[in-house]
């Protein structure tokens, strides 16, 4: 909860600074002189409310959504020795990481993958694919679980949702400023909001949304390195490197995890060049090298 309050306070501070800065540079006067009557402070608050609403709602229902979209079956009473081992391993890693025992589940997928989600580090879900359990060694599975526990302990799900809320706010804000500018200044519309406003706003939201996604995905890639470090601390550097190397061997397999969950998996696929800027995970080679340098 403290993390949420700090991010909300930070966002409100940024909103205030942005509003004051635009006013100091005469943006309000420029827009008013061209027939655009905008209350930037009110617009920023409006965008902040709606920008955060979606990301926070997604965060609070993330466990439910993950179970529904991946078909994850929660292990409440272990029926096999593999399930018993999985529960015991997660409990051990959680205790070492200083968090409460998360829910543990298995989802039906051939590819080797795992994810962690939940609105609170003490109310989380950790799930692994059937393929990972079948083909990875116990040490490799333990390292993958340690990586996911690292995400939970670091509060990555909350932080990522709040970062998304911040960028949502400014995408909405600047898209509407651009829409008003095009409608009032370029098309000289003097009666309400014309079609140019809506078209320009939609186009601006699409373009700014792509740029904002690059920011969010950059942060997501940073958190993967941190989770790898946490996994190395909990399971050992050699085991963490071994798990990532095994994932690299299987990288050609299609990832069937829903798009909404790929950012939370340990294996995010492979893309290079400009497309790499929109990837939630850094290349496995970079992650392995970072762990080797860490020693």
From Swiss-Prot:
<dbReference type="GO" id="GO:0005886">
    <property type="term" value="C:plasma membrane"/>
</dbReference>
<keyword id="KW-0482">Metalloprotease</keyword>
<keyword id="KW-0862">Zinc</keyword>
<comment type="similarity">
    <text>Belongs to the peptidase M48B family.</text>
</comment>
<feature type="transmembrane region" description="Helical">
    <location>
        <begin position="41"/>
        <end position="61"/>
    </location>
</feature>
<keyword id="KW-1133">Transmembrane helix</keyword>
<dbReference type="GO" id="GO:0004222">
    <property type="term" value="F:metalloendopeptidase activity"/>
</dbReference>
<keyword id="KW-0997">Cell inner membrane</keyword>
<feature type="active site">
    <location>
        <position position="148"/>
    </location>
</feature>
<dbReference type="InterPro" id="IPR001915">
    <property type="entry name" value="Peptidase_M48"/>
</dbReference>
<dbReference type="InterPro" id="IPR022919">
    <property type="entry name" value="Pept_M48_protease_HtpX"/>
</dbReference>
<feature type="binding site">
    <location>
        <position position="147"/>
    </location>
    <ligand>
        <name>Zn(2+)</name>
    </ligand>
</feature>
<dbReference type="GO" id="GO:0008270">
    <property type="term" value="F:zinc ion binding"/>
</dbReference>
<dbReference type="InterPro" id="IPR050083">
    <property type="entry name" value="HtpX_protease"/>
</dbReference>
<feature type="binding site">
    <location>
        <position position="224"/>
    </location>
    <ligand>
        <name>Zn(2+)</name>
    </ligand>
</feature>
<keyword id="KW-0472">Membrane</keyword>
<protein>
    <recommendedName>
        <fullName>Protease HtpX</fullName>
        <ecNumber>3.4.24.-</ecNumber>
    </recommendedName>
</protein>
<feature type="transmembrane region" description="Helical">
    <location>
        <begin position="199"/>
        <end position="219"/>
    </location>
</feature>
<keyword id="KW-0378">Hydrolase</keyword>
<dbReference type="Pfam" id="PF01435">
    <property type="entry name" value="Peptidase_M48"/>
</dbReference>
<feature type="transmembrane region" description="Helical">
    <location>
        <begin position="4"/>
        <end position="24"/>
    </location>
</feature>
<dbReference type="GO" id="GO:0006508">
    <property type="term" value="P:proteolysis"/>
</dbReference>
<keyword id="KW-0479">Metal-binding</keyword>
<keyword id="KW-1003">Cell membrane</keyword>
<keyword id="KW-0812">Transmembrane</keyword>
<feature type="binding site">
    <location>
        <position position="151"/>
    </location>
    <ligand>
        <name>Zn(2+)</name>
    </ligand>
</feature>
<keyword id="KW-0645">Protease</keyword>
<feature type="transmembrane region" description="Helical">
    <location>
        <begin position="158"/>
        <end position="178"/>
    </location>
</feature>
């Amino acid at each position: 909860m403290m993390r949420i309050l700090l991010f909300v306070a930070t966002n409100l501070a940024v909103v205030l600074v942005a509003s004051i800065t635009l006013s100091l540079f005469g943006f309000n006067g420029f827009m008013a002189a061209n027939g655009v009557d905008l209350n930037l402070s009110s617009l920023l608050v409006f965008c902040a409310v709606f920008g955060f609403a979606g990301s926070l709602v997604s965060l609070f229902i993330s466990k439910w959504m993950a179970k529904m979209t991946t078909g994850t079956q929660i292990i409440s009473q272990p029926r096999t020795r593999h399930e018993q081992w999985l529960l015991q391993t997660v409990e051990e890693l959680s205790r070492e990481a200083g968090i409460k025992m998360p829910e543990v589940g298995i989802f039906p997928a051939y590819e080797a993958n795992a994810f962690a989600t939940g609105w609170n580090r003490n109310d989380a879900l950790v799930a692994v694919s059937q393929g990972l359990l079948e083909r990875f060694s116990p040490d490799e599975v333990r390292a993958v679980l340690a990586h996911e526990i690292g995400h939970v302990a670091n509060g990555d799900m909350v932080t990522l949702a709040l970062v998304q809320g911040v960028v949502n706010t400014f995408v909405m804000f600047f898209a509407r400023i651009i829409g008003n500018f095009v409608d009032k200044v370029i098309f000289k519309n003097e009666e309400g909001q014309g079609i140019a406003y809506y078209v320009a706003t939609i186009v601006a939201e699409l373009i700014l949304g792509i740029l904002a996604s690059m920011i969010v995905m950059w942060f997501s890639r940073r958190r993967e390195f941190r989770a790898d470090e946490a996994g190395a601390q909990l399971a050992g550097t050699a085991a963490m490197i071994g798990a990532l190397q095994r994932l690299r061997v299987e990288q050609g397999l299609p990832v069937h995890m829903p798009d909404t969950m790929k950012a939370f998996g340990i294996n995010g696929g492979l893309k290079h060049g400009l497309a790499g800027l929109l990837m939630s995970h850094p290349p496995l080679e970079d992650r392995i090298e970072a762990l080797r340098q860490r020693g």
